[in-house]
Amino acid sequence: MRGLRIVGLHVRKHWFIYFAGIGMVATASLLAAQIPRLLGIVTDGLRDGTLDTAKMAQYVGLIILIGIVRVATGWGGRVLVHHKGRELTYNLRKQLFEKWGTLSPSYYHRHSVGDMISHALSDVEVVRELVSQGINQAVSGLAMLLAAAWLMAVHVDWRLTLAGLGPLLLIPLLVKWLGPQIRLQSQRSQEALGAMAQTTEEVIGGIRAVKAFGTEHIVISRFENKVDDIVEEKMRFVRLSSLFGALVPLMVNLGFIFVLGYGGFLLTAKVISLGDFVAFTLYVALLRQPLEQLGNVLNIIQRSIASLNRIDELLRVVPEVLDREGYILDRPLQGTLKVQGLTFRYPGSERAVLHDISFSVGPGQTLGIIGAMGSGKSTLADLLLRLYDPPDGTVSIDGEDILHYPLARLRDGIAYVPQDGFLFSTTVLENIGFSDEYPDRKRAERCAEITAVHENIISFPEKYDTEIGERGVRLSGGQKQRIAIARMIYKDAPFQIMDDSLSAVDTSTERRILRNLLDLARLFPGSAKNPSKATIIISHRLSAVQHADEIVVFADGRIVERGNHTELLSIGGHYAGLWYMQAGITEESDSDGQRDISQPDLDVEMDVLEAGRMEEVL
């Protein structure tokens, strides 16, 4: 039931609008409740012959006036309530989106995209139904029920009123019996819908792999299973909901039968008049719709509680990474990074993935990080971005602990290219200028030239205004990576981090991009904001880091070697072995098993690699 606080806060915030809307809807129902009584008076007048033409015209005019006012107030009240219901829909989706932006990657490892889509679409719509249609029907039905019961008891006969409304006392028992079952089944239906959305997202996102493997029949079968699950859960919900919806009118019909029987007896006994009997019969008939509305409202409430609880559970999730309280440095980053004795393990895990990592990089410098998959390179990038919090005192920027910077300030000072080079389903220009609300076209073109993708872009039908499709599906892998790097350059941040972002680029283009980036790291022409950059290049391709000022070699979460390219080759260790493997060069080993590395050999092999004759084996 905690989820109901969401609705309570919303109604309390807009209490005046809801008060006005509810008042107008209630007024419409109260006016409608007067019509049976007026018809009863007209019936008695016609029977007794006391109703002349003038009075008849008055009653007809009064009934017409009541009808007009009822329609106007009912329409106005419903519009007000529905408008605020739409506003709640907007606010809830905004809150969900903002919450997702604060959550760490570990949350997304535990929850599927489909489930989150179900929250934003299906659950929010169910809540909107509660605060718009639910409130309107509840007020209308309840006002009509109370007004009719009062008029029947006061102007007709209280005993007949009890006979007509007595069966309705069973409705609370129905709510207690079926309510929890409806609520539980609604939650299961929403979860099944989330699972189907996840399957749909995966199949569409991986449609190339599906077609390449010719497994359409397999994914269709899996999708059908998900749909069958939804149908099964929905049918269980429909059976329970329909049972509840059928039993409420049954109670109304029982009341109508009691009224006909007992009312007929009172009429023949001359306890009530014919007009009273007609009015009472009309009241009971009039109550059918509001009682069905109240039954529908109870159904909506049970479904909404399940959705509200799901939304509330998400909104209550506490982000694992937050701005620290106390000493906060809200100032721009300058570009000096130092990592000292960093050991890190993921939350909930006892195994450390990084062990005693130390290095530093300053403005105008480039640090290369290489290592096999799973060696901890990307984890380090996550820590620098504070997607996870590093231990206190292990990572500092400009001489201050990284934890002392606000998250917004920290991430504003870092331009990052992820491994997958993720692009958004918008134009090329908006992807490159993603850090600006209104991207500068000339600046975007200059960044594209630096990453050697400008020539490709101007060949597109709409050039920089070309829509690239979901995740850049209309682009090649190399084009996506180069646009992602251009996006990093466009941001013009003091720190640049590239996480294996050149894997889909050919060697000559890679060499051109890296040469431009090295120049950029030292001086970005026309940039007074950040004249020099501290650049970190993470890669398993050694050609991407060979010109870095310092290279650190990761293995099993540890730094096993460090130095520049020439120094690491002269050591003849892990880096040198990787270099020769990627260059596709083999030599006979000396008798002692050690390879003799001479400077001429190095020069020749570097030329070979630069020419692009290499074979990746990592």
Tell me the role of every PLM-derived stretch:
Residues 1-15, 116:
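A short amphipathic helical element positioned immediately N-terminal to and/or at the very start
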